[in-house]
């Protein structure tokens, strides 16, 4: 039997992708914080 916990890339990108983050001021803060911290991946 297959599990239902697959994870859909479209949903993931839409909610926590780079462009989704840039859309809101708080999302921009997230990107800014991750840049400052030196994260290799800024978003999903």
UniProtKB/Swiss-Prot annotation:
It comes from the Bacteria. Residues 1-22, 31-44 have a biased composition (Basic residues). GO terms for biological process: translation. Keywords: Ribonucleoprotein, Ribosomal protein. Residues 1-44 are annotated as: Disordered. The gene is rpmH. It comes from Nostoc punctiforme (strain ATCC 29133 / PCC 73102). One of its GO terms (molecular function) is structural constituent of ribosome. PROSITE patterns: RIBOSOMAL_L34. This is Large ribosomal subunit protein bL34. InterPro entries: Ribosomal_bL34, Ribosomal_bL34_CS. The keyword Transmembrane does not apply. One of its GO terms (cellular component) is ribonucleoprotein complex. Belongs to the bacterial ribosomal protein bL34 family.
């Amino acid at each position: 039997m297959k599990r239902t916990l697959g994870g859909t890339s479209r949903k993931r990108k839409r909610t926590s992708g780079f462009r989704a983050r840039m859309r809101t001021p708080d999302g921009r803060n997230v990107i800014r914080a991750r840049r400052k911290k030196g994260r290799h991946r800024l978003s999903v």
